[in-house]
Amino acid sequence: MRVGYGYDVHRLVDGRPLVLGGVTIPFDKGLKGHSDADVLLHAVCDALLGAAGLGDIGMHFPDKDPKYKNIASTRLLEETGRKIAQEGYKIVNLDATLVAEAPKIGPYRQEMVSVIAKCLGLENRQVNVKATTTEGLGITGRGEGMAATCVACLE
């Protein structure tokens, strides 16, 4: 059994769609980044890569590479899943947490779980997505950005 931990944070900005867990969510701001800036999927990728001893998302999908400009993070997750499989690992489960004051993800949570599971060839029961706030503290609490964490177990 191998365990990996992923963390990511992105700034909220005007003029971009908000994509979380592969789902576009109605909101007045989106996340800034080279790709679609899906903070949740980036944390999932980092957790998986870490568990397999394959470094991090920046090593595999550098933000200076133009081919990743505005790429859907679901594509990055699919490629991460292929890399994990090529190393001979199977994903046991994922547990991801979004850290943000708004929007509430309850109405979108199950769709996020389904998207992540589909990208990785998993059953929905192998993927957990939840959210929390920082009670108004820090960059997420002030609404300046969003963060996400993820724990991945491989065998």
Swiss-Prot record:
Keywords (A to Z) from UniProt: Isoprene biosynthesis, Lyase, Metal-binding
Cofactor binding mode and count: Binds 1 divalent metal cation per subunit.
EC numbers for this chain: 4.6.1.12
Residues reported in the UniProt entry to bind 4-CDP-2-C-methyl-D-erythritol 2-phosphate: 8-10, 34-35, 56-58, 61-65, 132-135, 142
Any matching Pfam family: YgbB
Cofactor needs: a divalent metal cation
Residues that, per the record, bind a divalent metal cation: 8, 10, 42
BP GO terms, sorted: isopentenyl diphosphate biosynthetic process, methylerythritol 4-phosphate pathway; terpenoid biosynthetic process
Keyword Kinase in annotation: no
Function: Involved in the biosynthesis of isopentenyl diphosphate (IPP) and dimethylallyl diphosphate (DMAPP), two major building blocks of isoprenoid compounds. Catalyzes the conversion of 4-diphosphocytidyl-2-C-methyl-D-erythritol 2-phosphate (CDP-ME2P) to 2-C-methyl-D-erythritol 2,4-cyclodiphosphate (ME-CPP) with a corresponding release of cytidine 5-monophosphate (CMP).
Self-association state and partner proteins as the record states: Homotrimer.
Name recorded for this polypeptide: 2-C-methyl-D-erythritol 2,4-cyclodiphosphate synthase
Organism, scientific name: Desulfatibacillum aliphaticivorans
Taxonomic lineage: Bacteria, Pseudomonadati, Thermodesulfobacteriota, Desulfobacteria, Desulfobacterales
